[in-house]
Amino acid sequence: MRLLIVGAGSTGGYFGGRLAQADRDVTFLVRKGRADQLKATGLQIVSPHGDVALTPKLVTAETIASPYDAIILTVKAYSLDAALKDIAPGVGPKTMIVPVLNGMRHVDSIVAAFGQDALAGGLCSIAAALDDQGRIVQLSQFHNFVYGEMNGSRSERIEQLDAVMQNAGFDARLSSNIEQDMWNKWMFLATLAGVTCLTRGTIGDIAGAPGGADFVARFFDEVVSVASAHGHAPGASFLDPTRALLTEQGSTLTSSMYRDLMKNSPIEADQIIGDLLARGKQAHVDTPLLAAAYVNLAIYQTLRRPNT
């Protein structure tokens, strides 16, 4: 199975690098600057699960020569439109597109560009970042990749992808309910991003503040109410451990959006918070804390000066 990994940053570079190390047929679609860096230094991963150093196969949008069996989209949500244009030469009638973007807005964009049949569901969980040398540094132990057909079927193509993903150096799982899994991740991520960005603190900082745990619980309840109103109510197996994780005393947990905000970097405010707020309004769900978080992030985006 020929895989095209769109992006070789901390997410695409990590999972794609592990797949390449496991001798899977992996090519990375990258911009010229990242391509030049990878040609000079190779793709390097620094990880508690073992370091990786390899010479990756690379293409740019201008040099894609033929369709791929599967395309894994790992770009930030605000880069999706450009990525969909870039991958077009690599999409054939049987190509499967597996996005691991945050939120759910990207689903409609992919279907509009390439049709419902091209889309499969996906999500990943990893804490990683690029260092000043362009190496991918894994910041914690977890490295999970979940995928499945949006209708829950066990198609031939998804089983082929599962065979490629298994035993590739990370935790891989074929899901029979990937759409709910994607919503569950969105609920967790929206709450984590919203509360850490609003307070400029870790989960432990918030939990230790007067009223902090109650604030997080109310924020999470708003998010869950929106998901439930759209037919994606989570079960207790998600709710109970997630509530505990989000209110843990002493936790150093933060969100990637918070880390981006503190670095004056672009953020996925519209896709993670704004879209959820809009869906709440559509369903007549009252979400004052979500609204406060979105106003806060919108002001940051307005005032932000791009890094030079």
Regions found by a protein language model. Give the residues of each.
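NAD(P)-dependent Rossmann-like dehydrogenase/reductase catalytic/cofactor-binding core
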Residues: A217-T308
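Internal alpha-helical scaffold of NAD(P)-dependent oxidoreductase catalytic cores
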Residues: P89-G90, A113-A118, Q133-K185, A190-S237
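Short, charged/polar "capping" segments at the starts of alpha-helices
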Residues: R34-Q37, V107-D108, S155
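NAD(P)+-binding Rossmann beta1-loop-alpha1 motif at the extreme N-terminus of oxidoreductases
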Residues: M1-D51
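Rossmann-like NAD(P)(H) cofactor-binding subdomain of soluble oxidoreductases
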Residues: V52-R135
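Short, well-ordered alpha-helices that flank and scaffold nucleotide-derived cofactor binding pockets
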Residues: G17, Q21, K85-P89, A112, ...
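A structural signal for isolated positions on well-ordered beta-strands in alpha/beta enzyme cores
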Residues: R2-L4, T27, V98, V146, ...
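Generic preference for hydrophobic
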Residues: F28, L58-T60, Y147
